[in-house]
Amino acid sequence: MKIDQAAVAGTLESGDVMIRIAPLDTQDIDLQINSSVEKQFGDAIRATILDVLARYNVRGVQLNVDDKGALDCILRARLEALLARASGIPALPWEDRQ
Protein backbone atom coordinates (compact mmCIF):
# COMPACT_ATOMS: atom_id res chain seq x y z
CA MET A 1 0.00 0.00 0.00
CA LYS A 2 1.38 3.39 -0.97
CA ILE A 3 1.00 6.27 1.46
CA ASP A 4 0.43 9.41 -0.62
CA GLN A 5 -0.42 12.06 1.96
CA ALA A 6 -0.17 12.93 5.63
CA ALA A 7 -3.13 11.91 7.78
CA VAL A 8 -4.32 11.71 11.38
CA ALA A 9 -6.59 9.26 13.20
CA GLY A 10 -7.72 9.08 16.81
CA THR A 11 -7.96 11.42 19.78
CA LEU A 12 -5.98 12.31 22.87
CA GLU A 13 -8.76 11.12 25.19
CA SER A 14 -7.96 8.62 27.92
CA GLY A 15 -8.09 5.07 26.54
CA ASP A 16 -7.51 6.22 22.96
CA VAL A 17 -4.56 6.89 20.67
CA MET A 18 -3.76 9.61 18.13
CA ILE A 19 -1.58 8.54 15.23
CA ARG A 20 -0.07 10.79 12.57
CA ILE A 21 1.47 9.44 9.38
CA ALA A 22 3.49 11.07 6.61
CA PRO A 23 5.25 9.61 3.57
CA LEU A 24 9.05 9.43 3.48
CA ASP A 25 11.39 9.43 0.49
CA THR A 26 13.02 6.22 1.75
CA GLN A 27 11.62 2.74 2.43
CA ASP A 28 12.25 3.11 6.17
CA ILE A 29 9.64 3.15 8.91
CA ASP A 30 10.32 6.02 11.32
CA LEU A 31 8.25 5.16 14.41
CA GLN A 32 8.00 7.54 17.38
CA ILE A 33 5.89 6.40 20.34
CA ASN A 34 4.81 8.58 23.24
CA SER A 35 2.69 6.54 25.65
CA SER A 36 1.44 6.90 29.20
CA VAL A 37 1.94 3.12 29.53
CA GLU A 38 5.16 2.78 27.53
CA LYS A 39 7.15 1.19 30.36
CA GLN A 40 4.63 -1.61 30.73
CA PHE A 41 3.39 -2.02 27.16
CA GLY A 42 5.85 -0.22 24.86
CA ASP A 43 7.09 -3.42 23.22
CA ALA A 44 3.53 -4.66 22.63
CA ILE A 45 2.48 -1.30 21.15
CA ARG A 46 5.47 -1.31 18.80
CA ALA A 47 4.80 -4.94 17.78
CA THR A 48 1.13 -4.21 17.03
CA ILE A 49 1.98 -1.18 14.89
CA LEU A 50 4.64 -3.04 12.92
CA ASP A 51 2.29 -6.01 12.45
CA VAL A 52 -0.45 -3.83 10.94
CA LEU A 53 2.06 -2.07 8.67
CA ALA A 54 3.45 -5.43 7.52
CA ARG A 55 -0.06 -6.83 6.82
CA TYR A 56 -0.73 -3.96 4.41
CA ASN A 57 2.83 -3.89 3.04
CA VAL A 58 3.42 -0.29 4.16
CA ARG A 59 6.94 1.13 3.93
CA GLY A 60 8.46 4.57 3.66
CA VAL A 61 6.46 6.29 6.38
CA GLN A 62 6.93 8.39 9.47
CA LEU A 63 4.53 7.54 12.31
CA ASN A 64 4.00 9.59 15.46
CA VAL A 65 1.95 7.74 18.06
CA ASP A 66 0.49 9.49 21.13
CA ASP A 67 -1.03 6.69 23.18
CA LYS A 68 -3.25 7.29 26.19
CA GLY A 69 -3.71 3.66 27.18
CA ALA A 70 -5.56 2.36 24.12
CA LEU A 71 -6.36 -1.33 23.95
CA ASP A 72 -4.81 -3.39 21.16
CA CYS A 73 -8.09 -3.52 19.19
CA ILE A 74 -8.40 0.28 19.31
CA LEU A 75 -4.79 0.72 18.19
CA ARG A 76 -5.36 -1.61 15.23
CA ALA A 77 -8.61 0.13 14.24
CA ARG A 78 -7.01 3.58 14.39
CA LEU A 79 -4.07 2.37 12.29
CA GLU A 80 -6.33 0.86 9.65
CA ALA A 81 -8.40 4.06 9.44
CA LEU A 82 -5.19 6.06 9.18
CA LEU A 83 -3.86 3.91 6.33
CA ALA A 84 -7.09 4.31 4.36
CA ARG A 85 -7.01 8.10 4.80
CA ALA A 86 -3.31 8.42 3.97
CA SER A 87 -3.54 6.28 0.84
CA GLY A 88 -6.66 8.06 -0.42
CA ILE A 89 -8.82 4.96 -0.68
CA PRO A 90 -12.40 4.80 0.63
CA ALA A 91 -11.97 1.37 2.25
CA LEU A 92 -9.11 -0.97 3.05
CA PRO A 93 -8.47 -3.91 0.70
CA TRP A 94 -9.38 -6.62 3.25
CA GLU A 95 -8.83 -9.40 0.74
CA ASP A 96 -5.23 -8.25 0.08
CA ARG A 97 -4.09 -8.46 3.71
CA GLN A 98 -1.15 -10.80 4.13
From Swiss-Prot:
Post-translational modification O-(phosphoribosyl dephospho-coenzyme A)serine, affected residues: 14
Subcellular location per the Swiss-Prot or TrEMBL entry: Cytoplasm
GO cellular component: cytoplasm
InterPro entries referenced in this protein's UniProt entry, alphabetically: CitD, Mal_deCO2ase/Cit_lyase_ACP
Keywords on record: Cytoplasm, Phosphoprotein
Reported function: Covalent carrier of the coenzyme of citrate lyase.
Family, as annotated: Belongs to the CitD family.
Subunit architecture: Oligomer with a subunit composition of (alpha,beta,gamma)6.
Protein name: Citrate lyase acyl carrier protein
Organism: Citrobacter koseri (strain ATCC BAA-895 / CDC 4225-83 / SGSC4696)
